[in-house]
Amino acid sequence: MVETNSLLKKAYWSLAAAGLVYVSIVISLTYPAVQRLALYANKVNPAYWEDVNLVESFGFLKTQVQPFNLVTPDNETLYGWHLLPLHLCREHEAELDSDKPAGPEDDYTTTPAFKLLANDPNARVVVSFHGNAAHLGSAQRPESYRMLLGLSTPQNPIHVFAIDYRGFGISTGTPTEEGLIIDGVTLLNFLTSAPYNIPPSRIVIVGQSLGTAVTAAVTERFAFGSPDPTAIQPAIKDPEPFAGVILLACFSNLPNLIESYSVKGITPPILSPLKGYPRVQKWARSHILDTWDTAGRVARLTGVNTTLEIANPFYIEKALDLTIIHAKNDVEIPWREGRRVWMAATGERVKDAPGALSFEKRDANGGPNEVLIWENKSGKGDKAVKRVRWERVAYGGHNRVATFSTAALAVLRAFEE
């Protein structure tokens, strides 16, 4: 009996200690610095021991990647890669000097990579916004760039641009929601204004995980601007739509995400132990600083939500090609989060919402694959000016889905439709 009591006491104090640790973690996450460190994980940074300028170590030709620096309006320096398809590397082998020092040039506009894009009116651009942690050359990211470059043809070369947000890799600064939006808009402003002057209709934006939130925010900023006069705005007035916007493994917003997010599918969702304490859950959610409301942003982009303070009267006649792809076996951000974004974009639960389903396809045997297409024909005539495609695929997980053919086909479809 004494031994049983001793075991019960040990179990009790072990549970009490675990509970205390959990409560301490939740409370610590209400502090801005700790919260953002956990969200962005930018301190998990292989750039401390990896040289991102040595692009051969990531599987590229030295001549295939032109590193560059980009200075934001708030004076942060972002590091990026301009990646070329192999057929351009072969065709312009003499111009692309493999003996040049690794790293960004003092004047990027003097580089062959810049000239190959700037002087080709048929060239296309894919902007890739990566997820949290590490840098632009980490994990599956180089493979995803190679997949995108593989879509390039001599008639329509595809150039890929990727940056590290502020505080990531060797970029300066500290990440915040508005900070990352500034970073994304700065890159798109760089591409769409002088000296490049690339029309948005030749640009597809692809985001994965955290990058989907950046993608949605940048697209919204280009569509509507910002009511804040001090915020970054599109460099070109009333820009035309992007060729496509693709969200891979997205989430509706951060308060919703923390109810279901699991680190690598190993940990339980952070608020799951508080399911029986809704007030405490609400308190924890209310302390989230960077909410990243992708669901709200796509609803405004599709015209389902028209409550934007400074609605652009010209936007109703403009196109939107939005694709949302989520893997059924994503153990980090469950596919239902992607479905929430689809529901917000299409107004699935909004009475008298505009638009309607134009296509749906599901596995006949009740399998995981699903395709839904919604169109909002709010423009003149019968043109479908807003289109949203939802794809749930069986495989790809959270990160690898960005390297799968489904993602490549979405980019190809965006350029060709």
What do the PLM-derived regions correspond to, one by one?
Residues 71-190:
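Membrane-embedded segments
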Residues 87-123, 150-156, 224-240, 305-319, ...:
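Intrinsically disordered, low-complexity domain-flanking/linker segments in eukaryotic proteins
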Residues 129, 165, 247-248, 393:
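Alpha/beta-hydrolase
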Residues 71-72, 280, 285-417:
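Serine-hydrolase catalytic core
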Residues 207-211, 215:
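Gly/Ala-rich beta-loop-alpha elbow adjacent to hydrolase catalytic centers
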Residues 1-62, 352-353:
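N-terminal membrane-anchoring alpha-helices
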Residues 205-207, 246-248, 325:
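Short beta-strand immediately N-terminal to the catalytic nucleophile in serine-hydrolase-like folds
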Residues 217-311:
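Hydrolase active-site cap/lid region
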